[in-house]
From Swiss-Prot:
This is Pleckstrin homology domain-containing family A member 6. Residues 59-158 form the PH domain. The gene is Plekha6. The modification Phosphoserine is found at residues 247, 251, 314, 459, 461, 472, 665, 864, 901, 925, 973, 979, 992, 1065, 1142, 1146, 1149. It comes from Mus musculus (Mouse). InterPro entries: PH-like_dom_sf, PH_domain, PKHA4-7_PH. Residues 1-39, 163-346, 737-872, 888-984, 1093-1114, 1130-1173 are annotated as: Disordered. It holds the Pfam family PH. Residues 761-782, 789-799 have a biased composition (Low complexity). Keywords: Phosphoprotein. Residues 201-233, 940-952 have a biased composition (Basic and acidic residues). The modification Phosphothreonine is found at T868, T908, T1045, T1140, T1145, T1151. The keyword ATP-binding does not apply. Residues 953-967 have a biased composition (Basic residues).
Length: 1173
């Protein structure tokens, strides 16, 4: 064996060997090789109850604390107390505990430190690995302990069994050595002296250890010859082979020197003139070069063949245990060789001088009669074809003994065999080479006729070629025929190379490529290389596989035809079948629709899952883009500061260098950030497109389901299924909309084409949070009492309950009113959708359950007409909807008054009646229509983001406070307050002039016809101001100026009722009259900002340029200054003289907005309260 080969073997020597800890070391009780069945108590491996029993008398090799990686797959390390006794590692919870947590037989394990490929980051870690068992990882507390454990465990794994148990029965010795000479011709190394030098075979190590179930393929394939590799040389020439025989493939310890000379090849004994033609001068285990002797001499020689008996008995027990598990018949059946061949063997005459000392009871196997192995098909699954029985009878008639022949076999490269011939002695003639096709044809004939076995390949015993065949290379057609690179594997030749399989039922033979290769030269049976046989083999195998597959396909097709015929016969003949055919179990519509909706349910689940997943992706990408943008802006600002510093301090020495270095670093970072930002933006765009497509699909699916729900299908179950699907979709969409308010997931862009389910807000008609899905006439199972509750007649025209009224305008997500906080006692009148608690208060109806809230929204009989604004604004007419849309597009919300005007209260009942009537006319009058609610069929605006909403809140608050404080400076109230003022219970608060004017102005405007021209100019100005959005920062300086001006003037309560005695000049009167007119105009403007001109918003064409805004702003500032000046002058005059009161305004001064309502009231009745600060 070469150094290269030896090196390779040394690396894998401990991992290739069977580690049969499943079989206890029970001495054999029969001379027969196949011992009786043993009980299942022979199994001892694993953890706790399945762990091995510790020998209390055995000395403790090493003990200590180690960390062991948990076997659960989790990277968890458990501290355990480990004790190494008798080549087995036991571990406990602590040193005082007696119950064993587990045992690890270390035989044939390879113990070494961990490698980087193991991905173990813990310090002082080492491993014990085996080819067929999982790798155990241990961690010590110091490197010294690690080295000590590695050394101790390594020695236990490389155990050399001392000579013992010399009292092995003699028949067992017969059984140990009988299979030797039947396979291998005499070689040059067969001159070694006798049996007591016979090397110890590694399978003794297989009596213990955690096996993985691969090697026992050989162990039971030829259970009587587990050491065939070694002992085939022992008596092949009549001379027992000495320690020169090579170690078994995969044995944990190589053998000693084969011959005294190490690499010499003595002459063949007894005139044997033949050496293997394909391997000149080779033995069964030929060394490749002379230095292999040194390699072998480095290991102790194997002696004491008596130990083999113990190992053999263990292997027999293993075989019987596996047979017992698989239900294989006992060895006394027809195929047992002991039944046919209890006769002495026949050997050539020239073998007699060197014959074995055990000439008797050497049993042979006839061609095709080998004991069953675990790798063969079960006995009940294999029926011998006639030719097999014929061959068996023929072999029995021909003398009962084996005929030594040479069969040459070209193995397919898929089994990785080396090519060569096998020498087999014949009793009647010198060895010759037979034609290669002899064995191939016979074996292929058996392959084509034997039944398929999907689980286990065929046994090597089922072939008529040579008994030297340790295994049959021709597997069942279910085996894989993919071409693997040629390699020299002796894994089939020796059970030691194939350890016990992991599980009896595991699919371990499906793939042959994971079997470990063995270096060339260790396998003595080489087969000849012949391209013709090789090609013919491939063709025959492919043809046979194709035939088998075609046969299976034909059987399947015939079975399907037969099944369908039987079904038809049953259906046509059975009276019950006729009855069921006549009376279908379900209506046809339901039967078809149920299956459809089962499919739709799966599609909906997949689609909604994709939508949510894509939404998460988009949100993460948005967050990344925002983060990158913030970083970019910070870098740009830092660079800007650096540029400024360079301009300022560029002349200072050494300072510009630092700035330049800093600038360069910032520029590099900025470039990287911009690259990342561009990539993230592109990814976000693509993800958004995908998300929108998915959203469109969900919307289309929702519309389709809604249309199917609207169909006149009188089926409650089907309608419930559809309704459930709609709810599922809307739940997801509403959740996405609420979680992503900035992106506007209410699908406003699809509203034009979505039809009945345009919006996915929480008030969607089919939403589970709204009342449409419960009480709409389209709903198949209404929860409202009356005929609406009948699921079979969901659309009956005589239903007593009114149709669902559309949602109030405050719910429309296009635009929201400002969030001026109302008074505590008036908060219920003004909910603000943009406030954080809006969704909670709005959806739950101020603490009520959602169902009750939906029912109260639905049924006017359960709600008071003056309850909430959703009752006031129940059903907007078309003009109101258009006006509301226009107002939303102008981005100016309705500024609510601080108190509710009496005119509004007086108007509320009629407005409710009128709008409810319109809602009845515009709502559902037939089955095909559904309430439009507040959904616009045309274009819409996506919901504002949170930042925009907060900005609007600040603007409206600032504007409201400005208007209120400016009103405190006005000298007079053009309209006295109505008589219903005490009904509002405003404590310690006096209403300002513009609040008093609102009711009068609204009454005047509502009393007039739309075509009136008396107040056209103020209306145009009011509409223009209504459409303008004045930014609050424009008032920053002016508000402070206006707030500071009244503090400098003391205005007494009697100011408005007093008139100075001194008459004014005509110029002063004209100027004063002009100022009063301007003041009244301003009052009209400020008061009309709170009124929406219903029906007039679309007809007014108002410019939106910034110049008009600035002009109006300047006009207001001038009026404020004039008012302050006038008040100051009047205050000074009143402080000197208190004479007859005279009104500050001329009797001729017009007050158009308030005259119709204020003629019956004294002007100064409430003036003292009006101007009180």
């Amino acid at each position: 064996m070469s150094n290269k080969t030896g090196g390779k073997r040394s690396a894998t020597i401990n991992s290739d060997i069977a580690n049969h800890n499943m079989v206890s070391e029970v001495p054999p009780e029969r001379p027969n090789i196949r011992a009786t069945r043993t009980s299942r108590k022979a199994i001892a491996f694993g953890k706790r109850a399945h762990s091995m029993k510790r020998n209390p008398n055995a000395p403790v090799t090493k003990a200590g604390w180690l960390y062991k990686q948990a076997s659960s797959g989790v990277k968890q390390w458990n501290k355990r107390w480990f004790v190494l006794v008798d080549r087995c590692l036991f571990y406990y919870k602590d040193e005082k505990q007696e119950s064993i947590l587990g045992s690890i037989p270390l035989l044939s394990f390879r113990v070494a430190a961990v490698q980087p490929s193991d991905n173990i980051s813990r310090k002082h870690t080492f491993k014990a690995e085996h080819a067929g068992v999982r790798t155990y990882f241990f961690s010590a507390e110091s490197p010294e302990e690690q080295e000590a454990w590695i050394q101790a465990m390594g020695e236990a794994a490389r155990v050399q069994i001392p000579p013992a148990q010399k009292s092995v029965p003699q028949p067992v010795r017969h059984s140990l050595e009988k299979p030797d000479s039947e396979n291998i011709p005499p070689s040059k190394h067969h001159q070694q002296p006798p049996h007591n030098n016979l090397t110890k075979l590694e399978p003794e190590a297989k009596t213990r250890g955690e096996g993985d179930g691969r090697g026992c393929e050989k162990a039971e394939r030829r259970p009587e010859r587990p050491e065939v590799k070694k002992e085939t040389l022992v008596k092949a020439n009549g001379l027992p082979s000495g320690p020169e025989t090579a170690s078994e493939p995969g044995s944990p310890y190589p053998d000693g020197p084969r011959v005294p000379g190490g690499g010499e090849h003595p002459a063949q004994p007894n005139g044997w003139q033949y050496s293997s033609p394909s391997r000149p001068g080779s033995t069964a285990f030929p060394p490749h070069d002379g230095d292999s002797g040194g390699q072998r001499r480095s290991f102790p020689p194997r002696t004491d063949p008596d130990k083999i008996a113990q190992r053999k008995s263990s292997m027999n027990q293993l075989q019987q245990w596996v047979n017992l598990r698989r239900g294989v018949p006992p060895p006394e059946d027809l195929r047992s060789p002991s039944r046919f061949y209890p006769m002495p063997r026949r050997v050539p005459d020239y073998y007699n001088p060197y014959s074995s000392q055990y000439p008797d009871d050497y049993q042979y196997y006839p061609p095709g009669v080998r004991p069953d192995s675990i790798c063969s098909m079960p006995a009940y699954d294999r029926i011998s074809p006639p030719w097999a029985l014929e061959d068996k009878r023929h072999s029995f008639r021909n003398g009962g003994g084996p005929t030594y022949q040479l069969h040459e076999w070209k193995e397919s490269t898929s089994y990785g065999r080396q090519d060569g011939t096998v020498w087999i002695p014949s009793p009647s003639r010198q060895p010759v080479f037979y034609d290669e096709l002899d064995a191939a044809s016979g074996s292929l004939r058996r392959l084509s006729l034997q039944p398929r076995s999907h689980s286990v390949p065929r046994s090597p015993s089922q072939g008529s070629y040579s008994r030297a065949r340790i295994y049959s290379p021709v597997r069942s057609p279910s085996a894989r025929f993919d071409r693997l690179p040629p390699r020299s594997e002796d894994i089939y030749a020796d059970p030691a190379a194939y350890v016990m399989r992991r599980s009896i039922s595991s699919p371990k033979y499906d793939y042959l490529g994971d079997r470990r290769p063995v270096p060339a030269g260790l396998f003595p049976y080489n087969y000849p290389s012949s391209p013709t046989v090789h090609d013919k083999m491939d063709e025959l195998l492919d043809l046979q596989l194709q035939r088998n597959l075609e046969y299976l396909d034909q059987q399947m097709s015939e079975s399907e035809t037969l099944i369908s015929m039987v079904n038809r016969m049953v259906e046509n003949s059975s009276p019950r079948a006729h009855l069921f055919m006549q009376v279908p179990a379900y209506p046809e519509v339901f039967r078809d629709g149920l299956h459809t909706f089962k499919l739709n349910e799966q599609d909906t689940d997949k689609l909604l899952g994709k939508l949510c997943e894509q939404n998460k992706v988009v949100r993460e990408q948005e967050r990344l883009v925002q983060q990158l943008r913030a970083e970019k802006e910070s870098l740009e600002s830092a660079l800007m500061g650096t540029h400024q510093e360079l301009e300022m301090f560029g002349s200072q020495p050494a300072y510009p260098e630092k700035l330049l270095h800093k600038k360069e670093s910032l520029q590099n970072q900025l470039i990287n950030i911009r690259v990342e930002l561009s990539q993230a933006t592109t990814a976000l765009t693509n993800s958004t497109v995908v998300y929108e497509n998915l959203e469109s699909e969900v919307s289309a699916l929702h519309d389709e389901l809604w249309e199917q729900l609207n169909l006149d299908i009188q089926n409650e179950v089907l309608n419930r299924q559809i309704q459930k699907e709609i709810w599922r979709i809307q739940d997801v969409m509403e959740g996405l909309r609420k979680n992503n308010p900035s992106r506007g997931t209410d699908t406003a862009k699809h509203r034009g084409g979505l039809g009945p389910s345009a919006t996915y807000s929480s008030n969607s008609p089919a939403s589970p949070l709204s009342s449409a899905s419960l009480t709409s006439p389209l709903s198949p199972f209404s929860m409202v009492s009356g005929s609406q509750g009948s699921p079979t007649k969901p659309g009956s025209s005589e239903e007593p309950g009114p149709p669902r009224p559309p949602l109030p305008k405050a719910y429309v997500p296009l635009e929201s009113p400002p969030t001026v906080p109302p008074l505590p006692n008036e908060s219920r009148f003004w909910p603000y959708p943009n406030s954080p608690s809006w969704h909670r208060s709005g959806e739950t109806a101020k603490g009520q359950p959602k169902t009750g809230y939906e029912t109260s929204k639905k049924d006017p009989s359960q709600t008071s007409p003056l309850g909430t604004p959703r009752d006031i604004n129940l059903v907007p007419t078309r003009q109101e909807v258009e006006a509301e849309k226009q107002a939303a597009l102008n981005k100016v919300g309705i500024v609510p008054p601080r108190t509710k005007s009496p005119a509004e209260e007086e108007l509320t009942p009629s407005a409710v009646v009128r709008r409810t009537t319109n809602g009845l006319t515009n709502g559902l009058s037939s089955r095909q229509e559904r309430p439009k609610s507040a959904v616009f069929s045309g274009e819409g605006k996506v919901k504002m983001s949170v930042e925009e909403q907060m900005d609007r809140m600040r603007r409206h608050q600032s504007g409201s406070m400005k208007e209120k404080r400016r009103s405190l400076q006005l000298p007079a109230s053009p309209a006295p307050e109505p008589s219903t003022r005490p009904a509002y219970k405003v404590v310690r608060r006096h209403r300002s002039i513009h609040e008093v004017d609102i009711s009068n102005l609204e009454a005047a405007l509502r009393a007039e016809e739309p075509g009136g021209q008396a107040y056209e100019t103020p209306r145009e100005e009011i509409a223009r101001l209504r459409k303008m959005e004045l930014e609050p920062q424009h008032y920053d300086v002016d508000i402070s100026k206006e707030l500071s001006t009244p503090d400098k003037v003391l205005i007494p309560e009697r100011y408005i009722d007093l008139e100075p005695d001194t008459p004014l000049s005509p110029e002063e009167l004209k100027e004063k009259q002009k100022k009063v007119e301007r003041i009244k105009t301003l009052i009209a403007k400020s008061s009309m900002q709170n009124v929406v001109p219903i029906g007039e918003g679309d007809s007014v064409d108002v410019p939106q340029d910034s110049e008009s805004q600035l002009q109006e702003q300047e006009k207001r500032i001038e009026i404020s200054c004039a008012l302050a000046t006038e008040a100051s002058r009047r205050g000074r005059m009143l402080s000197v003289q208190c004479a007859t009161p005279s009104p500050p305004t001329s009797p001729a001064s017009p007050t158009p907005p308030v005259n119709p309502l204020s003629s019956d009231r004294p002007r100064g009745a409430d003036s003292s309260h009006t101007m009180r600060v």
